[in-house]
Amino acid sequence: MFTFLIPFLAKCTTNKWKRACQILEETLRSACNQTDQRFRVLIICHEVPDVSFDKQKCEFIQVNLPIIYPLTASPAQQMIFMQRSDKGRKILAGIKESRRNSSHYFMVLDADDLVSSNLVSYCLNQQNPNGYFINRGYRNDAQLPGYLFQRKNFYHECGSSFILNPYRAPYPDTNIDLTKETGENYFVRRYVVHAYVPSCMEKMGFPLQPIPFPAAIYRFHDSNIYATTLRPPDSALRRYGRLLLKGKKITHQLRTEFTIPPSM
C-alpha cells in the first residue's frame, strides 16, 4: 500500500481559505488518478476542507493541535514559523497513521502540487526497501499558464519529492507531545526542510533511489508561501526569458498524466 500524506493548513493561518480548498481539490484529483489502485490519500487537517471531489480513496484525519505563534517576529516570519510548525507536526501525525496501517511507503504531498499517474505503480513494483526521491520534476508558474519548466534537483525546491518506508523514516523512538512542539524540533523540522531528506536517510544507512522520470509538478502561485514571502518576484523580462529558454508547452499527454487543471 502507498499512502499520500497531505498536511493541510489551518483555516486561521490563511485569508484565502476558499482558494486553498479549490487548489487542494485539484491535488486530490491528481493523486487519485493513479494507474495502480493500491494507494490511499490521508489529508491531515484541523478543519475538514470544503471539497466536492469524490473522496472514496481519501480520508480526512482531524488533529487537535494548537497553532503555535512565535514570541517576537515580523508578520512574514510569524507566518513562516506558524505554517512550518503546523505542517511538520501534521506530517508526523500522518506518518504515525501510515505505520498503523502497514503502508509500504508514504509520500508527503503538498496541498497544491500534482503527481504523475505512474508514480504508485513504479514504486510498488520496484520495491526499493528504503524509498525514493524525485530528482526530476516540473515547475509551473501561475504567471505563465500553459507551460512547465523541467527542474533538476527537484527535491531541493519542492516538498513533494520523497517517498519513504515509514519504518525507516526519521521518527521519534518515543511519543512526543505534538501539541507543544514547534518547527525547531528535529523531527518536525526534518520533513519541512525537505532538501536534506535524501542525505539524512543515507546517513541513517537507508539510501533512497531517484525516480527515473519527472514525477511531480511544483505549483508556483500567489497562495504559495515561498512564492509570496521568501522569494522576490521575478521581473517580466526574466519570466519570459525563462519561457523562451526552458519552457515546455503543456501537452494533452502531460495534462492526462498529471491531471493538470484547465487553469494551468
Model-inferred region functions:
Residues L178-M264:
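C-terminal catalytic/acceptor-binding lobe
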Residues P49-S103:
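Active-site-proximal specificity loops/subdomain of glycosyltransferases
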Residues S102-L114:
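Short beta-strand-to-loop acidic/aromatic patch adjacent to the donor-nucleotide binding site
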Residues K11-Q22, Q78-F81, L178-R189:
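Short, flexible/disordered intra-domain loops and linkers
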Residues C45-E47:
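Acidic ATP/Mg2+-coordinating residue in the GHKL
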Residues S116-N185:
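Conserved catalytic core of nucleotide-sugar-dependent glycosyltransferases
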Residues M1-I6, S30-A31, F39-I43:
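Hydrophobic targeting segments
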Residues C21-R38:
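Short, acidic, metal-binding catalytic loop of nucleotide-sugar glycosyltransferases
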